[in-house]
Amino acid sequence: MVVSEKSKILIIGGTGYIGKYLVETSAKSGHPTFALIRESTLKNPEKSKLIDTFKSYGVTLLFGDISNQESLLKAIKQVDVVISTVGGQQFTDQVNIIKAIKEAGNIKRFLPSEFGFDVDHARAIEPAASLFALKVRIRRMIEAEGIPYTYVICNWFADFFLPNLGQLEAKTPPRDKVVIFGDGNPKAIYVKEEDIATYTIEAVDDPRTLNKTLHMRPPANILSFNEIVSLWEDKIGKTLEKLYLSEEDILQIVQEGPLPLRTNLAICHSVFVNGDSANFEVQPPTGVEATELYPKVKYTTVDEFYNKFV
């Protein structure tokens, strides 16, 4: 029996929030791993330290830029799979990646910068709606160009939302009172960043995820806001005072608050008021679910996540 070689993976945006987990997991999983890095990134002390870590994993650094077509094309010609984890300000620049993939003609799979909620199902308000629309546009362009793809839907980053339980500017879970978005009943989904990377790298060579949307829905992590608060209360042996932020309150803040806050709250409205994270079924043949495809992966549960905060 011939063991097929693991694909060569290029990660664009590898020094970003979720990108660094993907670079590490890809390299440690035995994939020849490449990271497209801007030369200016080396001048950032924090990013420079991260790049040294990448080198220790055996990652090949390719200097270039998503807006420089020549460097992009040169990088893409060296690999089999391209994963983009660029931030919101660069979503539209992924058009350049699509053009380069089309010109190179060697890419077996493209994973665009999704790594959030399913934008084809979400009913977001502005300013999140425009952000989601950019992702939708990139999806339709990939499909129109006939580029093989996988869209990765991981829902909430656990380390982003859970440490402060969605309490603005807090660093740890609340001990006295908690603000709950909406009535706290719609379910949402939380996945640890390391697990997101594991499921994603598992999927890159899997024919079952080709031209599919990969949904991450760990059963133990599909919880309502009220259920998470209750879980936390059980851990600390204390009942918290609960303040419910109504839909009207959220909409008012979204209209009047500063932009970063408005965007985050607009996403919270989609997830915690509309229930857009978990209010639909994963529909085959276009949708597949990660924990069903990869049952051997042991994911971190929300319950386990909070043990370190007790």
From Swiss-Prot:
The active site annotation covers 135 (proton acceptor)
**Cellular compartments annotated:** Cytoplasm
Q: What induces it?
A: Induced by methyl jasmonate in roots. Down-regulated by auxin. Accumulates upon the removal of flower heads and young leaves.
EC class name: oxidoreductase
Xref: InterPro entries: NAD(P)-bd_dom_sf, NmrA-like, NmrA-type/Isoflavone_red_sf, PCBER-like
Q: What is its main location?
A: cytoplasm
- GO CC annotations, alphabetized: cytoplasm
Q: Which UniProt keywords apply?
A: Alkaloid metabolism, Cytoplasm, NADP, Oxidoreductase
Which Gene Ontology MF annotations are present? NADP binding; oxidoreductase activity
Offer one example of a GO biological process linked to this entry: alkaloid metabolic process
Q: What is its EC number?
A: 1.3.1.-
Q: Where does NADP(+) bind?
A: 13-19, 38, 47, 139
Q: In which pathway does it act?
A: Alkaloid biosynthesis; nicotine biosynthesis
Tissues expressing this chain:
Expressed in roots.
Q: Which family does it belong to?
A: Belongs to the NmrA-type oxidoreductase family. Isoflavone reductase subfamily.
Assembly and interactions?
Monomer.
Further information: Root cells silencing A622 exhibit inhibition of cell growth, severely decreased formation of several alkaloids, and accumulation of nicotinic acid beta-N-glucoside and N-methylpyrrolinium cation.
What PANTHER family does this protein map onto? ISOFLAVONE REDUCTASE HOMOLOG A622 (PTHR43349:SF49), PINORESINOL REDUCTASE-RELATED (PTHR43349)
Q: What does this protein do?
A: Involved in the biosynthesis of pyridine alkaloid natural products, leading mainly to the production of anabasine, anatabine, nicotine and nornicotine, effective deterrents against herbivores with antiparasitic and pesticide properties (neurotoxins); nornicotine serves as the precursor in the synthesis of the carcinogen compound N'-nitrosonornicotine (NNN). Probable NADPH-dependent oxidoreductase that binds NADPH in vitro. Does not seem to be involved in the NADPH-dependent reduction of phenylcoumaran benzylic ethers.
What is this protein's record name? Isoflavone reductase homolog A622
Q: Which organism is it from?
A: Nicotiana tabacum (Common tobacco)
Instruction: Identify the taxonomic lineage of the organism of origin.
Output: Eukaryota, Viridiplantae, Streptophyta, Embryophyta, Tracheophyta
